[in-house]
Amino acid sequence: RRRLPGVPGYLRRSDNSGHRLMSSTLLAPWQYCPSLTRYERWWTRAVRIGEIGIGGHNPIRVQSMTTTDTMDTAATVAQSIRMIEAGCELVRITAPSKKDAENLAEIKKQIRAAGFNAPLVADIHFTPNAAEVAARIVEKVRVNPGNYADKKKFDVREYTDAEYAEELERIRERFTPLVRICKEHGTAMRIGTNHGSLSDRILNRYGDTPEGMVESAFEFLRICRDENYHEIVLSMKASNVQVMVQAYRLLVHRMMAEGWDYPLHLGVTEAGDGEDGRIKSAAGIGALLEDGIGDTVRVSLTEDPEFEIPVARALVDRYNDRRNHAPIPEVAQVPVDPFSHQRRHSREVLNIGARHVPVVMADLSNRTTITQASLFAWGYRYSVPLDKWNITDQACDYAFIGKHTIDFEIPGTLGIVQEHATWLTNKGKERHYPFFTKQDYLGGAERHPQFNLVYATLPDLDEAFITALKGDPTAVLLIDTHNAHGMAEQRRLLFELITKECPVPVIIGRAYGAISNDALVLHSSTDMGPLLIDGLGDGVFIADEQGGREDLVCRTAFGILQATRTRTSK
């Protein structure tokens, strides 16, 4: 049990390579995916890479990258095999020099001799000659358009249109030989933009922006298209998940406008290790997968690459049956800009909404009893000798305790939320607030003069309910979903509030049952991250029905806010 704007389909046409393309005839200003309410993968052309395909009807592929010295053949082969045995479908190997690129032949020979046929990808930076060697050996090469034909000088200058055109012609001369080699040898290519390594030319004209990232890739993509070469995968990586998500969305929007359909490789640069790396990757990659964007995934952790594969697999496997979700009402007009971050306008209720950072609400409702020790996992340490609370940087702001009561003095920064009937017997206690169902809230039940938490799902949101919320300066919504496509349903609810100009603050609530620790981290990050990236939440509430891991839930809640750059706690 997991409790707590769409548009019609596109017309399609074909280009000269015979692939189905999205028509720009119906393209809306926000459009970057088939639907914001119905799960559907964005259709891309199938690109052949060795014995597997990416895009089209192929499943979402998972891949990783070796960390060994490419000249250490034995170590690279051994690590590659470990990755493949862990489920890695493409193995990327760095080739920083021509010598490294040449050694890919021996690495490939030994991997094939061991009985493994996973395609190899050469990762190229700065060295066109290495790329041209590698393209004759491996099944795919990755180039970074920010440094393939440019050296970073950090020059600040204004380019005239003529000077810019000269720069593009210089790039064409450097890049075209690789394109022709790839075309001749049947080698695929990833044009992979990195937010941190845009060329001086791009930075001076477009800035360090998603628009600059997209244009950086398009400069190289246009050259490929001029050569009638289409075995291309694109990526827009960044360590900032807001920038990463916006860049991929803008990339798809621009491709739709052009009638292009190249598959996408998803990843967050240098996500980190442990829980933080998993949260950051899930928030960024998950935000795109939720909207049907992405044909291959690499989760970049500072761990051995074989440990990245189960994380990537766990992310993509959530979408195997997603198309069967319950219907969600479509949206006539999308009230947000998906290509930039702007927080939804909400009124201030205590320290929730408006200018305040999103709050974290703990769930203690399933505990047998609540004592001082119950708050330890949620960032509060009680010192018996000093008879005082010590508050950490990751201390929850509110705790939902259900039908329970508290018989000790709570920390000065903590608010307590109780079910309404229980609160009525405790309403004299400081910083104790009621939790309402829609029925009780609209039925005239007694309210707190400052803060009233009201539970809602999308089907609850009728005109009478919205009108009541608009007129109540003390109301805060705790939103939930019972839909398998839950993030989209909660986004639809938030769009409705924006459209109806209802400024009630919203705490995003999700509940999880008996799932593993890793699944809890990945699922909650994927479910809540996209909403926070779009500025749509004023708080988070993770209900772990399994119980017994409150410290993990607390770290995850704060980690999601940190990863989405909405609240810094470390």
What are these language model-derived features?
Residues 35-36, 41, 73, 84, ...:
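Active-site beta->alpha loop and helix N-cap motifs at the rims of alpha/beta catalytic domains
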Residues 48, 53, 61-64, 92-94, ...:
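Structured core elements
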Residues 23-65, 70, 179-185, 321-375, ...:
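N-terminal amphipathic alpha-helix/helix-capping segment at the start of soluble metabolic enzymes
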Residues 54, 59-60, 67-69, 148, ...:
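Short, glycine-/Ser/Thr-/acidic-enriched flexible segments
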Residues 159-175, 179-180, 201-354, 361, ...:
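Catalytic alpha/beta core domains of metabolic enzymes, predominantly
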Residues 2-8:
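Extreme N-terminal basic, low-complexity initiation segments
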Residues 10, 15-19:
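Intrinsic-disorder-associated, low-complexity terminal segments enriched in Asp/Asn/His/Tyr and depleted
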Residues 48-63, 68-87, 91, 97-100:
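N-terminal glycine-rich anion-binding loops that anchor highly charged ligand groups
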